[in-house]
Structures are given as structure tokens and as C-alpha cells.
Amino acid sequence: MAASGGRACVRSLRGGVLWRSSPCHYESTATRHFLGTLQKLPLQAGVRNFHTAPVRSLFLLRPVPILLATGGGYAGYRQYEKYRERKLEKLGLEIPPKLASHWEVSLYKSVPTRLLSRACGRLNQVELPYWLRRPVYSLYIWTFGVNMTEAAVEDLHHYRNLSEFFRRKLKPQARPVCGLHCVTSPSDGKILTFGQVKNSEVEQVKGVTYSLESFLGPRANTEDLPFPPASSSDSFRNQLVTREGNELYHCVIYLAPGDYHCFHSPTDWTISHRRHFPGSLMSVNPGMARWIKELFCHNERVVLTGDWKHGFFSLTAVGATNVGSIRIHFDRDLHTNSPRYSKGSYNDLSFVTHANKEGIPMRKGEPLGEFNLGSTIVLIFEAPKDFNFRLKAGQKIRFGEALGSL
């Protein structure tokens, strides 16, 4: 019967008929029923049944190739985007930034970066065995391009833990402070952006801004100010400008992990007020600054405000991932990345007291504070209209080198 059925099927095919004879259809149905029955049977020990597994199960058995393919494809796409951006930059074309959406920012902020940074801070303070110090520090030096010939102590065995290594001191002659210009760089780093502050918006990187008032917070109490405040009806920018004919300027310096982590006074000025903003600790590298609007307003930061010979002056140290610890040498009450402080609040401290009517005087180049790893310094200050920056965006700069002058 099977043979005749097979012949009937062959005759049908040879005859060019597009239908199958009933015996062939019967065999096909029976075969499918038999295979379906096998799939429903439980697997027995020592019996392999891979030939009856559905396609869905085969993919579940191989997640690694799928993840590698997906991740590789995304990485390739990102590399193509970077290559395209570099080509456009070489042609002199401006590349509009691609900002993160609200849900992307919220998702990133939900990552426990403060907790992770506290854990990293404690890990950095663990004393390393003497024999392990050289290989660990050498790996860090090689990875981030640290120049140890500038360090006051070049012997790697001298640094008991990573925290001491990050905060290493420099040789006195390693960073001469420029005396010809009125404003010098407070730290080593990379210039992200600089220029005049217009319409109460500050440029984070080219094409991405943040609110001046959100960044600095509301004006301090009038008794803390060394100069009378402007009318409350003025814009926030105009409230900071104290002298007619002056402008408000800004400069953003990004400190990479391999840079010198201390920061110094950029000019001769008097600090009258400190404001601490607990916040997130998102990465502040230039790529993230191009992606997240008002990144510096989201992150934890310490704002020092006061005055210099031309009016208002401020220096802000912005925290980042694994950089929850910001230290100001003369402020022992400051405790950053502390679980007792909640996001969205701020803590004020006035350095103007009955015993000290002026505040804390700082000389240009004098040590001011330090990070435990790379981060960002933002300068916002008042100066006459003929103030000129001697910079270009993206350039590397070292502590003590000129930022600008009149």
C-alpha cells in the first residue's frame, strides 16, 4: 500500500499536477502526528532528544552568542557615529548634540551611584600590602597616563592606599603660577567651554546649557554679601553683576582620572559663603555632558562664592561617579556624599562672622581643596567687558597657567 501510494505521488509530480494524492497526504499527516507525540514524551535519562526541540528552545540554550551579537552591533553603531562626527568636525561642520530623554535621565539617576561611590571611597582607603603597591599603581599610571615625575614623592611604595595616591602632592617647581594674568587655572584638566553668560544660561558644552540659578541656587542672605544685591526684579544674571559696565563670564574645566586632583585659588579673592548641594553622582566626562542637559545641576557640588577686585566671583567643585568626596581645606563642617543629606536640598555656611567681617582671603595659587578622583571645576565671575580668555575649547591646561586677563 505504501509502495502504491509512493508511485501515485510520483505520477502526480511527473504529470505536473499541483495536488498530492491522498496516500501521500495520509503519510505526511501520520508522520507529523508521530513527531508531535515524541515531543510530548518526557525525556529519559541518557536519551538525547535535540532533534525534536523547538527552535525557541535552541535560542534559549545559546544566550551568549545573542548577547555578543547585540552588543557588538550596538558598539559598532556607536563607533560609526563617532567616526561620522569626527569626519564632520574635520569638515568644519557643527554637530548638533543628541540629548537624553527624560526617561533616560531618570533611569540613569536611579542607579545607586552615591552608594557605589561611598563603597569605592572606603575601598580606596584600604591599606595595600607593600608588595602590591607598585603593580597596582603602575597599572593605574599606564591606564590614565599619569606623569609621576611631577610628584613630590615618586616612590610608589610611599602611598599606603589609592586615596593617598590620588591626592599626591606635586613638586614646588612643577606648576609655576602665572603672575602676568589676573585669572589662572585652578587645576589640571581639559577646557570644555568658556565665554560670557547670557540670558542666565551657562554653556555646559557647545550647544548644551544649564540654568545659572539652578546651578548656584538662590542668592545668599544679604548680610553674607560683601556688596549690596541688585533688585529682585532683575534676572538672576543681573543680580550677580555688581558694577555697571561689567559682564559675567564662565569657564568649565574637566579633570580626568589621570590629572592632578587638587585645586587651587584661581585669583586673589575673598570667600564669604559656601553652599553644598547633595545630588546624584553621574559621570561628568565630555560625552555625558553632551548627552544630559543640566548635568552639573543634577550632580552633587560645592559652591564657593565671594568677591574679587572686579566684583562677584565663584568656584564650584562638581562631584561625579566615584568622586563623592569633595574636600575644602578650611571647611571642616563639609561632608559630601553623606546618606543623611537628601537630594534636592542644600546646606549653607557663611564665613562672615562677628569675629571675621570679611570672610576667608585666598591668594592666587593657594591650595583650596581636592577630589578623590577626576571631576569638574566651574568658574563664574564678574569682570569688565575687555576681559579676554586666552583659551580654546578642548585644550589641555595645567594648574597655574593663564585663563584670561584684562
Swiss-Prot record:
Catalyzes the formation of phosphatidylethanolamine (PtdEtn) from phosphatidylserine (PtdSer). Plays a central role in phospholipid metabolism and in the interorganelle trafficking of phosphatidylserine. May be involved in lipid droplet biogenesis at the endoplasmic reticulum membrane. Signal peptide: none annotated. It catalyses: a 1,2-diacyl-sn-glycero-3-phospho-L-serine + H(+) = a 1,2-diacyl-sn-glycero-3-phosphoethanolamine + CO2. The chain crosses the membrane at residues 61-79. It comes from Mus musculus (Mouse). InterPro entries: PS_Dcarbxylase, PSD-B, PSD_type1_euk. Widely expressed, with highest levels in testis, including Sertoli cells, followed by liver. This is Phosphatidylserine decarboxylase proenzyme, mitochondrial. Its main location: mitochondrion. It holds the Pfam family PS_Dcarbxylase. Keywords: Cytoplasm, Decarboxylase, Lipid biosynthesis, Lipid droplet, Lipid metabolism, Lyase, Membrane, Mitochondrion, Mitochondrion inner membrane, Phospholipid biosynthesis, Phospholipid metabolism, Pyruvate, Transit peptide, Transmembrane, Transmembrane helix, Zymogen. It is found in: Mitochondrion inner membrane; Lipid droplet. The keyword Membrane applies. Residues 80-406 are mitochondrial intermembrane. Heterodimer of a large membrane-associated beta subunit and a small pyruvoyl-containing alpha subunit. Pathway: Phospholipid metabolism; phosphatidylethanolamine biosynthesis.
